[in-house]
Amino acid sequence: MAKLKDMKLDILAFGAHPDDVELGCSGTIAKEISLGKKVGIIDLTRGELGTRGTVEIRNTEATKAAEILGVSVRENLDMRDGFFVNDETHQLEIIKMIRKYQPEIVLCNAIQDRHIDHGKGSKLVSDACFLSGLIQIKTEINGEAQRPWRPKVVYHYIQWQTIEPDFVVDISQFIDMKMKAVQAYSSQFYDPKSNEPVTPIASKNFLESIQYRAKDLGRLVGVEYAEGFTVERYVTVNSLGDLK
């Protein structure tokens, strides 16, 4: 099992589409990597139903964004954009990734959002995290049996829809890296020279709104920029001094 141990990550972030993770929690990812944590990203789909760009372009953009953030690994599960479901087949694909990388923390899509894939992806990953710890569920990769593994916690980042966070992470020193990673997806966002249709995320003020939300969350906790998360169960601290 040494091979699996070598692949162990501290944090594994899932997104229904390439760019979900960057938009929702890339500041936090950059911060954790700077602290020595190993982080990976798993995209569920290629975003093939997106109005702008192509699958090939988005693949290149996802690779560029991963390099900017410095993540250890990025994979895509090739689920059907818009039509993946929360069933055994899809759960097993997630379980294989969880057991392969054995993360302590999983980050995933918002619990509900404008895009239906976000809520679906959120529940799919959350359910798979629980099931991954059950010894009677057997999986293997490349002919090698996998051990059960259940992440300690699952946190949901916030996307289009405004959701009250349960906690926030100070990303003041990493807002520039976050925006650089987001802007790696140039096919998806505002370009005055583009002849492609204008979409909600390709509107002129969208990138400004991403930075504004981070600034507003930061304002509420006395820092310059922050990202918010929701939790599935109570968060434990060792002492009141851990809270700010």
Go through the PLM ranges and name each one.
Residues M1-Y101, T230, L240-D242:
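Active-site rim/loop-helix segments in enzyme catalytic domains that contact anionic ligands
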Residues A2-L12, E88-K244:
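Metal-dependent de-N-acetylase/amidase catalytic core
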